[in-house]
Curated annotation (Swiss-Prot):
It is found in: Mitochondrion inner membrane. It holds the Pfam family NADH_dehy_S2_C. GO terms for biological process: mitochondrial electron transport, NADH to ubiquinone; mitochondrial respiratory chain complex I assembly. InterPro entries: Complex_I_Subunit_2, NADH_DH_su2_C, NADH_UbQ_OxRdtase_chain2, ND/Mrp_TM. Belongs to the complex I subunit 2 family. This is NADH-ubiquinone oxidoreductase chain 2. GO terms for cellular component: mitochondrial inner membrane.
Length: 347
Protein backbone atom coordinates (compact mmCIF):
# COMPACT_ATOMS: atom_id res chain seq x y z
CA UNK A 1 0.00 0.00 0.00
CA UNK A 2 1.17 3.53 -0.82
CA UNK A 3 2.67 5.19 2.32
CA UNK A 4 0.59 8.33 1.74
CA UNK A 5 -2.60 6.26 1.48
CA UNK A 6 -1.73 4.41 4.69
CA UNK A 7 -1.09 7.71 6.48
CA UNK A 8 -4.42 9.18 5.33
CA UNK A 9 -6.32 6.05 6.41
CA UNK A 10 -4.62 5.97 9.83
CA UNK A 11 -5.35 9.69 10.32
CA UNK A 12 -9.01 9.05 9.43
CA UNK A 13 -9.19 6.18 11.95
CA UNK A 14 -7.74 8.44 14.66
CA UNK A 15 -10.11 11.27 13.67
CA UNK A 16 -13.15 8.95 13.85
CA UNK A 17 -12.18 7.73 17.33
CA UNK A 18 -11.46 11.32 18.46
CA UNK A 19 -14.92 12.45 17.29
CA UNK A 20 -16.53 9.67 19.36
CA UNK A 21 -14.41 10.59 22.41
CA UNK A 22 -15.18 14.32 22.25
CA UNK A 23 -18.81 14.23 21.17
CA UNK A 24 -21.85 14.55 23.42
CA UNK A 25 -24.28 14.34 20.46
CA UNK A 26 -25.57 11.01 19.17
CA UNK A 27 -25.30 11.96 15.48
CA UNK A 28 -21.63 12.95 15.78
CA UNK A 29 -20.92 9.73 17.68
CA UNK A 30 -22.47 7.63 14.91
CA UNK A 31 -20.52 9.66 12.32
CA UNK A 32 -17.25 8.94 14.17
CA UNK A 33 -17.98 5.20 14.20
CA UNK A 34 -18.70 5.21 10.46
CA UNK A 35 -15.50 7.13 9.64
CA UNK A 36 -13.54 4.67 11.72
CA UNK A 37 -15.11 1.63 10.06
CA UNK A 38 -14.72 2.85 6.47
CA UNK A 39 -11.05 3.77 7.03
CA UNK A 40 -9.95 0.49 8.62
CA UNK A 41 -11.42 -1.79 5.92
CA UNK A 42 -8.71 -0.90 3.30
CA UNK A 43 -6.07 -1.46 6.01
CA UNK A 44 -7.48 -4.93 6.70
CA UNK A 45 -7.32 -5.68 2.95
CA UNK A 46 -3.81 -4.32 2.36
CA UNK A 47 -2.33 -7.79 1.66
CA UNK A 48 -5.08 -8.31 -0.94
CA UNK A 49 -5.57 -12.07 -0.79
CA UNK A 50 -8.78 -14.12 -0.41
CA UNK A 51 -8.35 -14.49 3.37
CA UNK A 52 -7.95 -10.76 4.00
CA UNK A 53 -10.89 -10.00 1.67
CA UNK A 54 -13.07 -12.46 3.61
CA UNK A 55 -11.92 -11.00 6.94
CA UNK A 56 -12.68 -7.44 5.81
CA UNK A 57 -16.14 -8.50 4.56
CA UNK A 58 -16.95 -10.18 7.89
CA UNK A 59 -15.77 -7.10 9.76
CA UNK A 60 -17.86 -4.78 7.57
CA UNK A 61 -21.04 -6.87 7.94
CA UNK A 62 -20.67 -7.06 11.74
CA UNK A 63 -19.90 -3.37 12.19
CA UNK A 64 -22.64 -2.30 9.75
CA UNK A 65 -25.20 -4.41 11.66
CA UNK A 66 -24.04 -2.87 14.96
CA UNK A 67 -24.32 0.63 13.46
CA UNK A 68 -27.88 -0.09 12.26
CA UNK A 69 -28.87 -1.24 15.77
CA UNK A 70 -27.22 1.88 17.21
CA UNK A 71 -29.16 4.18 14.84
CA UNK A 72 -32.42 2.39 15.73
CA UNK A 73 -31.68 2.86 19.44
CA UNK A 74 -30.85 6.56 18.92
CA UNK A 75 -34.18 7.11 17.11
CA UNK A 76 -36.14 5.30 19.87
CA UNK A 77 -34.36 7.39 22.51
CA UNK A 78 -35.06 10.59 20.54
CA UNK A 79 -38.77 9.74 20.28
CA UNK A 80 -39.04 9.26 24.07
CA UNK A 81 -36.74 11.98 25.40
CA UNK A 82 -36.60 14.50 22.54
CA UNK A 83 -32.85 14.84 23.20
CA UNK A 84 -29.73 14.06 21.16
CA UNK A 85 -27.50 14.18 24.25
CA UNK A 86 -25.62 10.94 24.95
CA UNK A 87 -25.97 11.05 28.73
CA UNK A 88 -29.79 11.30 28.52
CA UNK A 89 -30.70 7.66 27.76
CA UNK A 90 -33.83 7.02 29.79
CA UNK A 91 -35.69 4.47 27.66
CA UNK A 92 -34.96 0.83 28.64
CA UNK A 93 -35.34 -0.50 25.07
CA UNK A 94 -32.99 2.16 23.67
CA UNK A 95 -30.43 1.52 26.42
CA UNK A 96 -30.49 -2.25 25.80
CA UNK A 97 -30.11 -1.83 22.03
CA UNK A 98 -27.21 0.61 22.48
CA UNK A 99 -25.50 -1.88 24.80
CA UNK A 100 -25.95 -4.71 22.25
CA UNK A 101 -24.59 -2.51 19.43
CA UNK A 102 -21.49 -1.52 21.41
CA UNK A 103 -20.90 -5.09 22.59
CA UNK A 104 -21.01 -6.23 18.93
CA UNK A 105 -18.43 -3.59 18.03
CA UNK A 106 -16.21 -4.68 20.93
CA UNK A 107 -16.57 -8.39 20.12
CA UNK A 108 -17.88 -9.56 23.48
CA UNK A 109 -19.73 -12.87 23.83
CA UNK A 110 -22.23 -13.88 22.52
CA UNK A 111 -21.34 -11.56 19.59
CA UNK A 112 -17.69 -12.61 19.52
CA UNK A 113 -17.62 -14.97 16.52
CA UNK A 114 -16.17 -12.42 14.10
CA UNK A 115 -13.13 -11.53 16.25
CA UNK A 116 -10.96 -14.70 15.83
CA UNK A 117 -11.89 -15.10 12.15
CA UNK A 118 -11.14 -11.48 11.22
CA UNK A 119 -7.91 -11.35 13.25
CA UNK A 120 -6.66 -14.59 11.68
CA UNK A 121 -7.35 -13.32 8.15
CA UNK A 122 -5.37 -10.07 8.40
CA UNK A 123 -1.70 -9.22 8.91
CA UNK A 124 -0.13 -8.84 12.36
CA UNK A 125 0.03 -5.04 12.05
CA UNK A 126 -3.67 -4.86 11.08
CA UNK A 127 -4.52 -7.23 13.94
CA UNK A 128 -2.70 -4.88 16.32
CA UNK A 129 -4.96 -1.96 15.30
CA UNK A 130 -8.06 -4.17 15.38
CA UNK A 131 -7.48 -5.48 18.92
CA UNK A 132 -6.25 -2.22 20.51
CA UNK A 133 -7.26 1.09 18.92
CA UNK A 134 -10.66 -0.15 17.72
CA UNK A 135 -11.70 -0.91 21.33
CA UNK A 136 -11.32 2.70 22.51
CA UNK A 137 -14.41 4.30 20.91
CA UNK A 138 -17.06 1.71 21.97
CA UNK A 139 -15.64 1.55 25.52
CA UNK A 140 -15.65 5.35 25.84
CA UNK A 141 -19.33 5.40 24.83
CA UNK A 142 -20.14 2.66 27.36
CA UNK A 143 -18.30 4.77 29.95
CA UNK A 144 -20.62 7.71 29.23
CA UNK A 145 -23.90 5.77 29.39
CA UNK A 146 -23.04 3.25 32.15
CA UNK A 147 -25.63 4.61 34.67
CA UNK A 148 -28.49 3.64 32.33
CA UNK A 149 -27.15 0.19 31.31
CA UNK A 150 -28.92 -3.00 32.40
CA UNK A 151 -26.56 -4.40 35.06
CA UNK A 152 -27.58 -8.06 34.73
CA UNK A 153 -27.18 -7.99 30.93
CA UNK A 154 -23.68 -6.51 31.17
CA UNK A 155 -22.53 -8.89 33.92
CA UNK A 156 -23.82 -11.93 32.00
CA UNK A 157 -22.01 -10.87 28.81
CA UNK A 158 -18.82 -10.15 30.76
CA UNK A 159 -18.73 -13.53 32.49
CA UNK A 160 -19.56 -15.30 29.22
CA UNK A 161 -16.71 -13.42 27.48
CA UNK A 162 -14.18 -14.41 30.16
CA UNK A 163 -15.34 -18.03 29.85
CA UNK A 164 -15.26 -18.16 26.04
CA UNK A 165 -11.98 -16.21 25.89
CA UNK A 166 -10.39 -18.91 28.06
CA UNK A 167 -11.94 -21.99 26.47
CA UNK A 168 -11.59 -20.76 22.90
CA UNK A 169 -7.84 -20.27 23.15
CA UNK A 170 -7.08 -23.71 24.59
CA UNK A 171 -6.97 -25.68 21.33
CA UNK A 172 -5.50 -22.97 19.07
CA UNK A 173 -2.12 -23.13 17.35
CA UNK A 174 -2.39 -19.84 15.41
CA UNK A 175 -1.05 -16.90 17.42
CA UNK A 176 -3.47 -14.34 15.96
CA UNK A 177 -6.46 -16.44 17.04
CA UNK A 178 -4.93 -16.86 20.50
CA UNK A 179 -4.55 -13.07 20.76
CA UNK A 180 -8.16 -12.65 19.59
CA UNK A 181 -9.51 -14.95 22.32
CA UNK A 182 -7.22 -13.18 24.79
CA UNK A 183 -8.82 -9.89 23.73
CA UNK A 184 -12.33 -11.29 24.29
CA UNK A 185 -11.38 -12.37 27.83
CA UNK A 186 -9.74 -9.03 28.65
CA UNK A 187 -12.79 -7.15 27.36
CA UNK A 188 -14.91 -9.24 29.74
CA UNK A 189 -12.75 -8.08 32.68
CA UNK A 190 -13.09 -4.45 31.59
CA UNK A 191 -16.86 -4.53 31.15
CA UNK A 192 -17.57 -6.35 34.43
CA UNK A 193 -16.07 -3.51 36.48
CA UNK A 194 -17.67 -0.76 34.35
CA UNK A 195 -20.80 -0.82 36.53
CA UNK A 196 -18.95 -0.48 39.85
CA UNK A 197 -15.91 1.65 38.96
CA UNK A 198 -15.73 2.95 35.36
CA UNK A 199 -12.37 4.68 35.96
CA UNK A 200 -10.83 1.30 36.80
CA UNK A 201 -12.20 -0.01 33.51
CA UNK A 202 -10.33 2.73 31.59
CA UNK A 203 -7.14 1.98 33.54
CA UNK A 204 -7.53 -1.70 32.63
CA UNK A 205 -7.94 -0.69 28.96
CA UNK A 206 -4.68 1.29 29.09
CA UNK A 207 -2.72 -1.65 30.56
CA UNK A 208 -4.35 -4.07 28.09
CA UNK A 209 -3.35 -1.87 25.12
CA UNK A 210 0.24 -1.68 26.41
CA UNK A 211 0.52 -5.48 26.82
CA UNK A 212 -1.20 -6.37 23.53
CA UNK A 213 0.83 -3.81 21.56
CA UNK A 214 4.05 -5.21 23.05
CA UNK A 215 3.06 -8.75 22.15
CA UNK A 216 2.14 -7.89 18.55
CA UNK A 217 5.36 -5.89 18.07
CA UNK A 218 7.40 -8.85 19.30
CA UNK A 219 5.50 -11.20 16.98
CA UNK A 220 6.13 -8.84 14.05
CA UNK A 221 9.85 -8.63 14.95
CA UNK A 222 9.99 -12.44 15.07
CA UNK A 223 7.73 -12.97 12.01
CA UNK A 224 5.85 -15.54 14.10
CA UNK A 225 2.27 -16.55 13.28
CA UNK A 226 1.99 -20.04 14.82
CA UNK A 227 3.26 -22.00 17.82
CA UNK A 228 5.61 -24.02 15.60
CA UNK A 229 7.34 -20.82 14.40
CA UNK A 230 7.71 -19.75 18.05
CA UNK A 231 9.59 -22.99 18.77
CA UNK A 232 12.33 -21.95 16.34
CA UNK A 233 12.59 -18.35 17.53
CA UNK A 234 15.02 -19.03 20.40
CA UNK A 235 17.72 -20.09 17.92
CA UNK A 236 17.20 -16.97 15.82
CA UNK A 237 16.69 -14.20 18.39
CA UNK A 238 16.95 -15.14 22.09
CA UNK A 239 16.59 -11.52 23.34
CA UNK A 240 13.21 -10.94 21.71
CA UNK A 241 12.11 -14.47 22.65
CA UNK A 242 12.85 -13.81 26.34
CA UNK A 243 10.85 -10.58 26.24
CA UNK A 244 8.01 -12.40 24.49
CA UNK A 245 7.92 -14.98 27.27
CA UNK A 246 7.66 -12.25 29.95
CA UNK A 247 4.94 -10.40 28.00
CA UNK A 248 2.92 -13.61 27.59
CA UNK A 249 3.02 -14.29 31.33
CA UNK A 250 2.04 -10.68 32.00
CA UNK A 251 -0.97 -11.05 29.66
CA UNK A 252 -1.95 -14.10 31.69
CA UNK A 253 -1.94 -12.03 34.89
CA UNK A 254 0.90 -13.85 36.63
CA UNK A 255 2.51 -11.95 39.53
CA UNK A 256 4.90 -10.11 39.85
CA UNK A 257 4.25 -8.80 36.32
CA UNK A 258 2.08 -5.82 35.31
CA UNK A 259 -0.87 -7.92 34.10
CA UNK A 260 -1.58 -9.02 37.67
CA UNK A 261 -2.42 -5.43 38.79
CA UNK A 262 -5.74 -4.94 36.90
CA UNK A 263 -7.05 -8.38 37.89
CA UNK A 264 -6.08 -7.74 41.50
CA UNK A 265 -7.79 -4.30 41.55
CA UNK A 266 -10.95 -5.57 39.81
CA UNK A 267 -11.38 -8.50 42.23
CA UNK A 268 -10.75 -6.14 45.16
CA UNK A 269 -13.36 -3.66 43.87
CA UNK A 270 -15.96 -6.41 43.34
CA UNK A 271 -15.47 -7.77 46.86
CA UNK A 272 -15.84 -4.22 48.25
CA UNK A 273 -19.28 -4.16 46.61
CA UNK A 274 -20.30 -7.38 48.43
CA UNK A 275 -19.89 -9.55 45.34
CA UNK A 276 -18.19 -12.85 46.18
CA UNK A 277 -19.39 -15.48 43.68
CA UNK A 278 -18.64 -13.36 40.59
CA UNK A 279 -14.95 -12.59 41.38
CA UNK A 280 -14.43 -16.22 42.44
CA UNK A 281 -15.73 -17.46 39.06
CA UNK A 282 -13.65 -14.85 37.23
CA UNK A 283 -10.47 -15.87 39.07
CA UNK A 284 -11.09 -19.56 38.26
CA UNK A 285 -11.80 -18.81 34.58
CA UNK A 286 -8.65 -16.65 34.39
CA UNK A 287 -6.66 -19.86 34.95
CA UNK A 288 -7.80 -21.05 31.50
CA UNK A 289 -6.15 -18.01 29.94
CA UNK A 290 -3.04 -18.49 32.05
CA UNK A 291 -2.84 -22.13 30.92
CA UNK A 292 -2.61 -21.36 27.20
CA UNK A 293 -0.18 -18.50 27.87
CA UNK A 294 1.99 -20.94 29.84
CA UNK A 295 1.74 -23.40 26.95
CA UNK A 296 2.93 -20.69 24.55
CA UNK A 297 5.76 -19.80 26.94
CA UNK A 298 6.79 -23.46 27.01
CA UNK A 299 6.74 -23.59 23.19
CA UNK A 300 8.74 -20.37 22.99
CA UNK A 301 11.51 -20.84 25.54
CA UNK A 302 11.67 -24.45 26.67
CA UNK A 303 11.45 -26.42 23.41
CA UNK A 304 13.60 -26.43 20.30
CA UNK A 305 12.75 -28.04 17.01
CA UNK A 306 15.53 -30.07 15.35
CA UNK A 307 17.60 -27.61 13.32
CA UNK A 308 20.84 -27.46 11.38
CA UNK A 309 23.98 -26.69 13.38
CA UNK A 310 24.59 -23.36 11.66
CA UNK A 311 21.11 -22.11 12.65
CA UNK A 312 22.08 -22.23 16.33
CA UNK A 313 24.63 -19.49 15.66
CA UNK A 314 22.31 -17.17 13.72
CA UNK A 315 21.55 -14.95 16.73
CA UNK A 316 25.25 -14.06 17.03
CA UNK A 317 25.26 -12.44 13.59
CA UNK A 318 21.74 -11.00 13.44
CA UNK A 319 21.21 -7.64 15.21
CA UNK A 320 18.21 -7.41 17.55
CA UNK A 321 15.67 -5.06 15.96
CA UNK A 322 14.43 -3.16 19.03
CA UNK A 323 12.99 0.34 18.76
CA UNK A 324 12.70 2.78 21.71
CA UNK A 325 8.89 2.52 21.49
CA UNK A 326 9.01 -1.28 21.76
CA UNK A 327 11.42 -1.09 24.70
CA UNK A 328 9.13 1.35 26.55
CA UNK A 329 6.01 -0.74 25.90
CA UNK A 330 7.66 -3.97 27.05
CA UNK A 331 8.94 -2.26 30.21
CA UNK A 332 5.44 -0.98 31.08
CA UNK A 333 3.90 -4.36 30.19
CA UNK A 334 6.14 -6.36 32.51
CA UNK A 335 7.66 -4.16 35.23
CA UNK A 336 4.89 -1.74 36.28
CA UNK A 337 3.43 -3.77 39.19
CA UNK A 338 5.18 -1.53 41.82
CA UNK A 339 3.07 1.35 40.42
CA UNK A 340 -0.14 -0.37 41.62
CA UNK A 341 -0.68 2.17 44.49
CA UNK A 342 -0.60 4.93 41.85
CA UNK A 343 -3.11 2.98 39.72
CA UNK A 344 -5.40 2.60 42.76
CA UNK A 345 -5.24 6.34 43.49
CA UNK A 346 -6.10 7.13 39.85
CA UNK A 347 -9.11 4.80 39.90
Amino acid sequence: MNPMTSTILLMTIMSGTSIVLMSSHWFMTWLGFEMNMMAIIPILMKNYNPRSMEAATKYFLTQATASMILVLAIIINLMHSGQWTITITENITASTLITIALVMKLGLAPFHFWVPEVTQGVSLSSGLILLTWQKIAPLSLLYQIYPSINTNLLLTMSLLSIMIGGWGGLNQTQLRKIMAYSSIAHMGWMIVIMIYNPNLSLLNLFIYIMMTSSMFMLLIANSATSTSSLSQSWNINPTITTMMMATLLSLGGLPPLTGFAPKWMIIQELTKNNSVILPTLMAILALLNLFFYMRLTYSTALTMFPTMNNMKLMWQFQPTSMTPMMTMLISISTLALPLTPLFISLS
